[in-house]
Amino acid sequence: MNRQVYNPFLPLNEYIPDGEPHVWGDRVYHYGSHDKEGGYTFCMQDYVVYSAPVKDLTSWRCEGITYRASQDPAYPELKYMYAPDVVRGNDGRYYLYYCMGGDYGYGGYTGPISVAVCDTPAGKYEYLGHVQYKDGTVMKKYICFDPAAMNDDGTIRIFYGTQYGYEEEPDFLTNGRLDDEVSMFGRTKEEILGYKDSIMGPIMVVLEDDMLTVKEEPRHIIPYAVKETSFEKHPFFEGSSMRKVGDKYYFVYSSWQNHELCYAVSDYPDHGFTFGGTIVSNGDVGYKGRSFENKLNMTGTTHGSIECIDGQWYVFYHRLTHKSDYSRQACAEKIYIAADGHIDQVEVTSCGLNDGPLVANGTYPAVIACNLTNGHMPHGSNSIYTTEFPNVTNKGEDRFIAEIEDGTLIGYKYFALEGSSTFGVNVRYETDANKVVYEGPVRVDERCENQEQLKDANDLAENVEGYFDICVTEDGESIGRIDIPVSEDISETEWRWCENRVDFPERVHAVYLVFVSYTHLRAHETLSDLVC
């Protein structure tokens, strides 16, 4: 079988969200923040870069740790580096832009933009300084967060910012939101109210060729007020990224929906943007009219960008694991930019960067499922859910889908099916001996969905036999079945192989497993094995 690649496209023990892909020479480099597997907060690890030949996206190579949080002067008061970007300067060197933050994001809105430099795209970066004014004063105008960098034919542009809708509330000055901004942003009320438009929103600053010094004052690229504009339903939240397609500027960002990457288009880099649409949602919300209530995954933060690699455009984004926003994995999909500049929303898939569907012959990790839902999946927030629902998780080096319940749908898109095949799954029933129990610190987020309601919706009986229905459409009829019998001869920690012969259609299709029972079931790393 030829080498393939699937989502997530990096090793399954790697968690690099907030992806910024860049092609330099004959390789594409993937930059991002770095989550810890099963971590208790965002971005707990040092920056690691992966790269691949532009002509072989199945072959990703780890370039190692390229920069450590301890190299920044804010460390250890602020321990973590958030979403970065890298740009090639006019001197041929590579410049890394990032912001520091603490546990749960505290301090992430209060600091400056830091800069590091390296002679190569993925070598060892060295701290250079902060973005500053000509007199050496550190630039902290607006909210320095999620910086993105662009060398626009010799002009160095940095895009950054975040946006909440507080200031469009009619009673903003009296409802307590101003106090919230003071706390979040580390500014006085007078400083916040002193901005002509708003302290929030997507911002652009132009730098001198030294890559540090402000050349043109920071300014909004999209007005803060979104009501009665094209951005009203999908306002900017965070995750700025800019690309140039032909003579148009494409601003890619994470919206207030907090599960989708959107784009806006302009003839200019600093004004004139019109909302274009959603590129991808990590719950497929909006794709072919899908509602948020009918999302196909736990949704949550996303951040990424688009890049043309060997003539094909892709969108890079991330998915959530471990029932939180703290262990996010890089994924990618092909996209198509129409002649009129429009980008249709794409669905999340398992095949991702693969040049076509996955071969229906071999063993695949269960955790490459692109759809995982029990019909009432939660939306992530700045916390970890402790109630039970289907999720991708790990125990040591074992990575699997846990807490599968009656009606859970597990989807894989797409396979090149070739008719009748043996289809099998590696499974075990969940017990106290093998259950994943989170034992780290737990932060309560008021935005987190009601855990008691989720618990009631996921109240399951245990030790009941079940089976997987096999389907090729989300709501279609079963074309096969794999029974998962209970056996006292098998230890609670042992995985069991169950299989059956299935008459698949001879064409490209999704494969869905739907569990039938009220038991907990875990699907092992090698959940599916399709053999012609």
Describe the residue ranges of each PLM region:
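Short beta-strand-plus-loop segments that form exposed binding edges in beta-rich domains
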Residues: L513-Y518
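Extracellular carbohydrate recognition and processing domains
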Residues: E474-R507
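Beta-propeller blade signature
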Residues: V48-V54, S114-T120, G201-E208, Y263-Y268, ...
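Short beta-strands within extracellular/lumenal beta-sheet-rich domains
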Residues: N394-T422, T431-G440, V444-E449, W495-E499
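Asp-box/WD-like beta-propeller blade repeats and closely related beta-sheet repeat scaffolds
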Residues: Y104-N151, T162-E181
